[in-house]
Amino acid sequence: VELAYYSDYAVRLVNSEEPARGIDTLTSVEAVRELFGPGQQAARRAGEADVTRLRTVRGRLRAVFEAAADGDEVRAVDLLNALLLEFPVSPQISGHEFRDEDGRPKWHMHIADHAANASAGYTATACMGLAFQLTELGVDRLGVCEAHPCRNAYLDTSTNRSRRYCSDRCATRANVAAYRARKRLYAERSERSERVERPGSGLTADAAQASSAAGER
């Protein structure tokens, strides 16, 4: 598994909460295990204490994404470095479970399970993956969805660094909202214009008044 894959751990954890909507799915041991994904042995070690630990880490990781989205690269890096120091990783070379066409192991870097607890292991993995993406792709690849009130975190892997939303659904919703806002503004401007026009003359009220004054003179 490539290190870049582990960055999704950070995204999944941050997006387990939607503060603006009052939604939090990280409320049980089962929710913690689901974060790890299928087939992860570390998930079996999860306990009630890991719920609280991961919710604390979640807030710190969200701060990394928000700093990056605000263009504050130094703050984003400092926040992530603090997490990396607190939750160090144990890298190992792995490959026995993956073979090439000749049956030889496909060696790759793997992050070993953390000895302390399930949440520490998850955090170390998430932070290492995020750090890899940040250094390889750039801090500006970390973003927060612009579709109000979503604010989900995402990693921009587009070729032109143009991503603004966490999903196609949010992009569509934002585009529809922008279209309706433009349409509403156009209607309001048209209505105001009609109000100041003098019926039957095509002149605005100010122009009609000036024309009348000139005629009296």
Predicted segments, located by residue:
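A structural preference for long, well-packed, hydrophobic secondary-structure segments
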Residues: 143-146, 162, 180
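Short helix-coil boundary/hinge micro-motifs
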Residues: 1-144, 148-155, 186-217
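Short metal-binding segments enriched for Cys and/or His
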Residues: 173-184
